[in-house]
C-alpha cells in the first residue's frame, strides 16, 4: 500500500501544478485499482471534480460514488480506435493508471492547456498517439 500511496501522491503532486481545480473534470483511469483510488481520494480532498473510469462498472459504481466522485464511466468510453488524432475535449486533466490505448485516448480528449500524468501499464506498455494534442492543445504530459 505504501508504494501505491507514493505513486498516487507523486502523480497528483505533478498534476496540481498544471491543472487548477476550477478548470473542469479530471479523469482517473483504472478507477478500482489501488493507485487510482488513492489518487481519487487526494484529488477530491483538494477540491477537484473527479470522473473515474473502470471495467467494473456494475460492481463498483456505488463504492466509487461514495468516495465523492462526480461520475463513474465504463472504460470503453476511454478506448478510442477511430485513428483520429484528436477527439472532443472532455477533461481538464487525466491521472492515468492504465497505459496503452486508454492513455492514448485520454491524451486525445484532454482540454486545451490540460495535463496528463501516467503511472501504470495494466492496459499495455505501448500506446500510439500523435504530436497534435501537444501542439494544438498545449498539452502537458508527465510520467
Regions found by a protein language model. Give the residues of each.
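Short amphipathic alpha-helix with an adjacent loop that forms part of the alpha/beta core around
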Residues: 78-90
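Short, well-ordered coil/turn residues at beta-beta hairpins
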Residues: 75, 96-97
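Glycine-rich phosphate-binding loop and adjacent beta-alpha segment
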Residues: 101-143
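Short acidic active-site motifs
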Residues: 59-60, 81-83, 101-105
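Short, acidic/turn-prone active-site loops that include or flank metal/cofactor-
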Residues: 55-57, 76-81, 120-124
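Mid-domain Rossmann-like dinucleotide-binding core that forms the NAD(H)/NADP(H) cofactor-binding site
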Residues: 2-76
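N-terminal Rossmann-like NAD(P) cofactor-binding module of classical short-chain dehydrogenase/reductase
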Residues: 92-95, 117
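Local beta-strand N-terminus motif with an aromatic residue
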Residues: 69, 90-92, 134
Amino acid at each position: 500500500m505504501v508504494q501505491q500511496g507514493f505513486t498516487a501522491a507523486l502523480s497528483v503532486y505533478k498534476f496540481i501544478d498544471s491543472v487548477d481545480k476550477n478548470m473542469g473534470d479530471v479523469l482517473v483511469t483504472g478507477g478500482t485499482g489501488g493507485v487510482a483510488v488513492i489518487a481519487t481520494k487526494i484529488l477530491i480532498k483538494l477540491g477537484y471534480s473527479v470522473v473515474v473510469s473502470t471495467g467494473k462498472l456494475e460492481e463498483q459504481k456505488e463504492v466509487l460514488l461514495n468516495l465523492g466522485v462526480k461520475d463513474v464511466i465504463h472504460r470503453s468510453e476511454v478506448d478510442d480506435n477511430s485513428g483520429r488524432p484528436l477527439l472532443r475535449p472532455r477533461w481538464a486533466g487525466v491521472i492515468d493508471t492504465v497505459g496503452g490505448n486508454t492513455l492514448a485516448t485520454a491524451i486525445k480528449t484532454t482540454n486545451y492547456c490540460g495535463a496528463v500524468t501516467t503511472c501504470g501499464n495494466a492496459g499495455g506498455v505501448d500506446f500510439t498517439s500523435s504530436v497534435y494534442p501537444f501542439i494544438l492543445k498545449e498539452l502537458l504530459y508527465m510520467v
